[in-house]
C-alpha cells in the first residue's frame, strides 16, 4: 500500500509539459505527499490537460480513514470504483516509498502514476492505483503504485485504459540510498 510519495519540483514543470506534449495550467508543486494531503493532479479538460489541486484519499462510509489505493486488478469490478472509471488522472511523482525504501527513475525524472478522481462535498479527491511489484520493489513490498509509461499518458486519460491495466510499466527503478551522516 503506497502512502508516501514525492511530487515534482517547481523547475520540473517544463519536463512534465514535454512528456504530456502540451502546456499545463494550475501546476502547484508539492514535496512529500501523504494521505489527506493536497497534490497536483493532471486531468483532461476539453482539449487540454490541467493540473488541479486534489486531496489524496476518498471518504468511504465503512471506514473513518480515507481510501487511498485501488487495486488495478479489481478496478473494473468493484462498485466503489466502477462509476468513476471515466474520471482517470495522472499523479505527478518523482519517487514513492514502499516497505521503508524510496524508489525513483534514473536522474530523478518525473513520472506519472495512474489514479482515479471524484468530486466529494469537501472537494476533489483522488486514489492511487496499485499493481504487483516490479523486480526493484518486490523485495520490499507486495504492491506498488501503477507506473505509467510516457506513451500511455494520453490513453490513460482519454482512451483505451483496459489495455493499460494489463500492462503496467515494470521497468526497474532505482532505490534511493541516503548517505550516512559523517558527524
What feature does the model see in each segment?
Residues 1-183:
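Short linear sequence motif anchored by a di-proline
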Amino acid at each position: 500500500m503506497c502512502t508516501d510519495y514525492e511530487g515534482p519540483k517547481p523547475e520540473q514543470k517544463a519536463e512534465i509539459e514535454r512528456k504530456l506534449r502540451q502546456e499545463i495550467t494550475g501546476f502547484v508543486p508539492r514535496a512529500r505527499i501523504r494521505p489527506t494531503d493536497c497534490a497536483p493532479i493532471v486531468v483532461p479538460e476539453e482539449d487540454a490537460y490541467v493540473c488541479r489541486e486534489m486531496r489524496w484519499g476518498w471518504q468511504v462510509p465503512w471506514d473513518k480513514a480515507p481510501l487511498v489505493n485501488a487495486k488495478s486488478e479489481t478496478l473494473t469490478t468493484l462498485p466503489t470504483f466502477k462509476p468513476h472509471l471515466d474520471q482517470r488522472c495522472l499523479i505527478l511523482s518523482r519517487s514513492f516509498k514502499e516497505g521503508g525504501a524510496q524508489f525513483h527513475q534514473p536522474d530523478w525524472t518525473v513520472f506519472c502514476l495512474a489514479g482515479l478522481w471524484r468530486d466529494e462535498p469537501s472537494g476533489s479527491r483522488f486514489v492511487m492505483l496499485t499493481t504487483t511489484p516490479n523486480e526493484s520493489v518486490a523485495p520490499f513490498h507486495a504492491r506498488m503504485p501503477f507506473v505509467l509509461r510516457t506513451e500511455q499518458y494520453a490513453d490513460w486519460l482519454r482512451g483505451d485504459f483496459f489495455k493499460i491495466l494489463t500492462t503496467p510499466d515494470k521497468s526497474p527503478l532505482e532505490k534511493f540510498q541516503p548517505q550516512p551522516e559523517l558527524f
